């Protein structure tokens, strides 16, 4: 949330974006290995790569090296209107490490906060040189390791899914000649208006400077977003954001408005601190952010298949070889659950006095449709010119009593996160994402589940029986056959171990066996 107009890049005297292809700097896509995992075949490597978002690239005239955009203004001659600008201006390649502080090695990606005059970055995972890797995650899970020990208050090391086009919009918009190869086609639930090119045209009409290096135009670019991870070493949240239109859509006027427009910009977040457990995640806490750990997110459907409807999003962690169940809610008026469901979101909005825009935009079902079609993985590091990241790690809004439910989100001071200060004081901050895996439930992680971490706090509104190894689903009485997708075994399980015909009991891990 609040991602609009916060990602800044200062390179070659311009923050740049374009739709033609330049030749001054060679185009490259650093390799970043990921893995696809199945119950039958285990995990196998994918030859995935990364590409820098086009908003960071140098934009110059196709006939030379005149900047099409300098400081916070478009060149009036090259860019008198959106279509002319798209024809006149070209994107170039990128020096990932030297200019942008982006280093990929094996399955590990390091994003440096400040490198020279560049601040922040955003990259996408690619399946090949011309297409983004598309993630279809219904009845699947997504796992990664993160080291955010050097990510202080006010910064956000984000890993999230966006309903972008696989080719970056080339097929839809013929004036876009660069495509995914150059990181085009961005959209999210904030309907950002600071994106330089949308739908193959420059966003020059109505352009107004908002800072020394950025501005906003008449248009925004909207799509459903799934924030798997927004965090620093003081706070973390995962948040689904539905839009009434899942595919990338250009907005104008009231359609771009937060929450009442095409998208639910605030979303339905699960931040452990905000949900009442202030000892769960942080430096030296249950999930110790001073050390690396694994984050697992499971997308549960109503029928336990990829054809079903998204009804629940679960979270668990693995650190020091131990599986850690997500924290449970400790807020009056909200059931003590530890996952996101439509019921949780409804109760949360009521308890916090917020309008339920999440439900108005279609809730989990709508997010699930984007996950069914396929979403693009974005990884970024950024600071927040709109709200100083207080919505993530401090008290927000700052004019409300911190004791009011939903206001306190972390321990960072309300004076923290000012971009000018954090860029000067913490230029060497960074985040490392590694070991990206996705696939069948309970196949992308390993770890020991202690009895104290086993919880039955998943929402009862989910009708799925594909449960995480760290949860305790209802057991079947002994002597009763277990239906397809039901639990049939595991440490601590006391129910029936006989599956209904023609299904058999399969061991998924020591703590959970399932009929299928």
UniProtKB/Swiss-Prot annotation:
Coiled coil: none annotated. Glycans are attached at residues 208, 326, 442. Residues 480-516 form the CBM1 domain. The keyword Signal applies. Disulfide bonds join 488-505, 499-515. Pfam families: CBM_1, Glyco_hydro_7. The biological conversion of cellulose to glucose generally requires three types of hydrolytic enzymes: (1) Endoglucanases which cut internal beta-1,4-glucosidic bonds; (2) Exocellobiohydrolases that cut the disaccharide cellobiose from the non-reducing end of the cellulose polymer chain; (3) Beta-1,4-glucosidases which hydrolyze the cellobiose and other short cello-oligosaccharides to glucose. This is Exoglucanase 1. It comes from Phanerodontia chrysosporium.
